[in-house]
């Protein structure tokens, strides 16, 4: 039983690492996308803001549908 408990702890540690990595990657991608959009303000301004607005809207809609 103790060995099983240890395995569960190891699994939790692994998943925690994975989740933190995914969160870090998401934020990194978001900031890269954000700055990339600002560098190309003249041509891609409308497209960039439309994409951000749409993605935020989708997240809000998903949150509302979950509740």
UniProtKB/Swiss-Prot annotation:
Keyword Transmembrane helix tagged: yes
TM segment ranges: 19-39
UniProt keyword annotations, A-Z: Membrane, Transmembrane, Transmembrane helix
GO CC, one annotated term: membrane
Location within or outside the cell: Membrane
Taxonomy, superkingdom: Eukaryota
Membrane topology: Single-pass membrane protein
Designated name of the protein: Putative uncharacterized transmembrane protein DDB_G0289959
Lineage, opening ranks: Eukaryota, Amoebozoa, Evosea, Eumycetozoa, Dictyostelia
């Amino acid at each position: 039983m103790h060995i099983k408990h240890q395995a569960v702890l190891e699994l939790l540690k692994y998943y925690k690492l994975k989740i933190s990595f995914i969160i870090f990657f998401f934020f990194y991608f978001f900031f890269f996308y954000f700055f990339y959009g600002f560098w190309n303000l003249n041509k891609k301004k409308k497209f960039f803001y439309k994409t951000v607005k749409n993605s935020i809207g989708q997240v809000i809609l998903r949150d509302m549908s979950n509740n």
